[in-house]
Amino acid sequence: MKGILLDNAGGDFHLVDTLEEPTPGRNQILVKSLVTAINPVEGFMQGTGQLVTAWPIVLGCDASGTVVEVGEGVTKFNNGDAVFGCTVLGTPGHSTFQEYFLMNENLAFKKPEGVTTEQAATIGAGLLTAALGVIIGAKVELKSQESTTESPWLIVLGAAGSVGQFAVQLGKLCGYRVLGSSSPSNTEIVKAAGAEAAFDYKLIVNEQLATIKQITNGNFSRVFDASAMGTETGIEALLQLADQSAPVRYFSTTNDWAPIEPRDGLATHQVELGQIGRSGTEKAEQINKDIASMIPKLEEYLEAGLLRPLEYVQVGDVGVGEILKALEAFNNHRSGKKLVVRLAEN
C-alpha cells in the first residue's frame, strides 16, 4: 500500500507504494484512511525521533475513515462503520499517513451523522489532549451544565490552537465561564469556541495577571495551559489570584518535559497524549484507562452538537502523495484552522 515514509530522525518524508497492509489483532480495527490531519507532533517526531518505536516509520495520528476489518473480540464496530480518532503514535501499522491503519477499539470514536469525514479528522488528538488537561488534570467534571454569572472561571492559556479551542468548548460545556489567552488576531477564534473573555498572551506576566484579576475577580481555581508555554502565568495566577478558599487549585499543561516545582495547595498535571495506546507502564495504563472512560461521553456530546469540530483547510487534491504538500504547508500555517488531506474518495 502507499504511504509517506520517514527513514530516520532528521530525514525527509517521501512517498512509497511498498508498505504492507496491517492486520488487526485482538480488540483492534483496520481502518481505510479517508482524511488525515496534520499536527505539530509530526514535525517534532521527524526532527527528534522521539515517540518513534521503529525505523523506518510512517507518521500521522489524526484521521477519519471506514472500518474494513475487525479483530477478534471487537464489539463496538463493524465493517463499514465510519470512525475517527487519535492512533498510537510512532508505531508501525497505526499511522494515518498511509492507506490503511490500525486503531484500538476502546480508543476510537464512532463518527456522528452530522459530522463530515473532513470535520471528523480535526477532532481526535485535539479533543483528547484537551480532555486529559481539563477533565483529568484540572478535575473538571465531564457533565453538561449551564453556567451562570456566579459560575467559576476556567482559564485556558493558548486558547486559539486546536487543543485550546477544544478546552474552551469543554469548559463551557461543563458549566464554567471561560477566559482564554491568545494573540489579539485570534481573539474571535477563542470567543467563537465559547470563551466569555480573552486576553493577550504576549503581555508580560504581570500584565497578564492584572488582566486575569480584573476579569475573574479571583473566582477560579483551575488553569489549563494548552500552549505548553504558560507555566509561569498559570501557576502565578493560581498562587496569587485564585480562590484561596478552594482546598486545592489545579494547574495542568501540555508541557510534559519541564519539571514543575511542588507548591502547597497546588495540584499539577502534565498531559502526555503520546502514551495513547501504549502499555507496559503504570502511567500509560492509567492514561489509556482515562481516555477510554471519556470517549463514550465525548461521542454523546459530539452527536448532540455540544462539542463541535474545528474549522479546517483541505490541502491539495485527493491522494496519499498530497500529504507531502500539507506537511510543507503546515510549516507556514498560522490561521488556527486545521490542515487536512483527503487520501481517498471513499
Positions of predicted regions on the chain:
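Terminal helix/beta-alpha structural elements that buttress the NAD(P)+-binding lobe
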Residues: M1-G25, K32-S64, E69-V70, T75-N346
